[in-house]
């Protein structure tokens, strides 16, 4: 059981592992079904298509490697594959999160209530429908914050040498932070915490959030496991919210 008051900081690895445990809790599983279905349908189809295209995309990406780096091609090839998986995985997980955002918010709310014993607002299906415009506005805020930064990093991929060495590392770090924002935002948004204030709060536990986001990013690239990662990450992020942020930011007790 996660405490409802602020506790000593734990690692992002801990909260990620908690997500796997919490997602199977009795009473929670029914709120997991819809996010899970969205993720299975979208990510399953997307990665099936991706693996049919890799033999075209990877040689194209490797063609940008300058002659003086050709001797490292045996190392750059797996980096190129990982780069494609990172970019592709993050792109489609973002789409899946847009579609499932109302259900992810409900999952975070119900899990928080069970972890803390607090009484959440009376939502239900009607409440979710009323909240959809606000939730979509929040997703749009995240997208606007993310897009210009992602474009800059994607441009780096087309710079010979940099695109095959530095860019993948920067993209991984960026996607780790962005996935931490994506999943931690659900419990924050349930309490109407502004997007900017939420980002400021996450920076107080930046290492833990980077660890959490990095693991989420890695599992997003792994076939089969990436089909269930969405509800797992929501549960893990909600546990982190309860331990680290709820005492200061909670709207309902």
Swiss-Prot record:
Transmembrane region positions? 31-51, 75-95, 151-171, 222-242
Supply the alphabetized keyword list.
Amino-acid biosynthesis, Cell inner membrane, Cell membrane, Cysteine biosynthesis, Membrane, Sulfate transport, Transmembrane, Transmembrane helix, Transport
Any one Gene Ontology molecular-function term assigned to this protein's record: high-affinity sulfate:proton symporter activity
Query: Can you list the disulfide-bonded cysteine pairs?
Result: none
Q: Which Pfam families match?
A: EI24
Localisation: Cell inner membrane
Bilayer topology: Multi-pass membrane protein
* A single GO cellular-component term on record: plasma membrane
Q: Does the keyword Membrane apply?
A: yes
Principal location: membrane
One GO BP annotation is:
cysteine biosynthetic process
Which InterPro entries does the protein's record reference? CysZ_sulfate_transptr, Sulfate_CysZ
What is the purpose of this protein? High affinity, high specificity proton-dependent sulfate transporter, which mediates sulfate uptake. Provides the sulfur source for the cysteine synthesis pathway.
Q: Which family does it belong to?
A: Belongs to the CysZ family.
Q: PANTHER family per the record?
A: SULFATE TRANSPORTER CYSZ
* Protein name, per record: Sulfate transporter CysZ
Protein species of origin: Citrobacter koseri (strain ATCC BAA-895 / CDC 4225-83 / SGSC4696)
């Amino acid at each position: 059981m996660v405490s409802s008051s602020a506790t000593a900081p734990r690692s992002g690895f801990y909260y990620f592992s908690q997500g796997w445990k919490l997602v199977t809790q009795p009473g929670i599983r029914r709120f997991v079904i819809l996010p899970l279905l969205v993720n299975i349908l979208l990510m399953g189809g997307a990665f099936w298509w991706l693996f049919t295209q890799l033999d075209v995309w990877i040689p194209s990406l490797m063609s940008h490697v300058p002659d003086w780096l050709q001797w490292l091609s045996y190392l750059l090839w797996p980096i190129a594959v990982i780069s494609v998986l990172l970019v592709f995985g993050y792109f489609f997980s973002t789409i899946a999160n847009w579609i499932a955002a109302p259900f992810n918010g409900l999952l975070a709310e119900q899990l928080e209530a069970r972890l803390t014993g607090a009484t959440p607002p009376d939502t239900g299906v009607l409440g979710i429908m009323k909240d959809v415009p606000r939730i979509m506005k929040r997703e749009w805020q995240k997208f606007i914050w993310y897009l210009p930064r992602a474009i800059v990093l994607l441009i780096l991929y087309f710079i010979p040498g940099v695109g095959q060495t530095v860019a993948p590392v920067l993209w991984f770090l960026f996607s780790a932070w962005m996935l931490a924002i994506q999943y931690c935002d659900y419990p924050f948004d349930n309490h109407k915490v502004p997007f900017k204030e939420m980002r400021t709060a996450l920076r107080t536990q930046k290492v833990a959030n980077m660890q959490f986001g990095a693991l989420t990013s890695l599992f997003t690239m792994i076939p089969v496991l990436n089909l269930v990662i969405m509800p797992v990450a929501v549960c893990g992020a909600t546990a982190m919210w309860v331990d680290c942020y709820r005492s200061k930011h909670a709207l309902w007790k």
